[in-house]
Amino acid sequence: MSSPAVGKSLPKPISISQVRQLLDQPAKLNTPEARRDKAMLELLYASGMRISELVSLNLGDVDTGGGYVRCFGKGHKERMIPIYERAARTVKEYIEEVRPKLAHKNDEVALFLNPRGERLTRQGFWQKLKEYVKSAGLNSQISPHTLRHSFATHMLSGGADLRSVQELLGHANISTTQIYTHLTTEHVRRTYEKSHPRAK
């Protein structure tokens, strides 16, 4: 398997425990915006979507009963992504209990809304994420894309095949997805050196 190109920086995922720590932050604030943010963070990590895809979602793009989200990636290419039950439930609760409090117009189709009842922007979500990263005491370099990197790395570490992860991420070329195999190989190497009696 080919190595990442020279000079190409590797994505920096965070650990599963750090993801959990981050996703737990909005629950500490009992506000409509915090409950929206919880749904967005869960969905981002559940799906591996790009932040631009997340904020572009409309109400009809999420099937919380079936556990799927439909998004449109680069080149307006559609893909259906399964999401875990907790994420589906969190989004369902947001749609039923929180979104009506944020929506000012009945004809607004955007899934995630700001306090003015308009579609939340990438910048708006990024600003909220920075606040949660800070309150969780995590690395300030964490961005929305970090959760996408973490999704891919954790899926491969958990046994997912490269082609499936490629489809979930919406990569046109598998070589783009292969960069994550380097990260999982590095993890295996560190585990080996830490665990093997003759490697210590």
Give the role of each language-model region.
Residues M1-K200:
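Conserved catalytic core of the tyrosine transesterase superfamily
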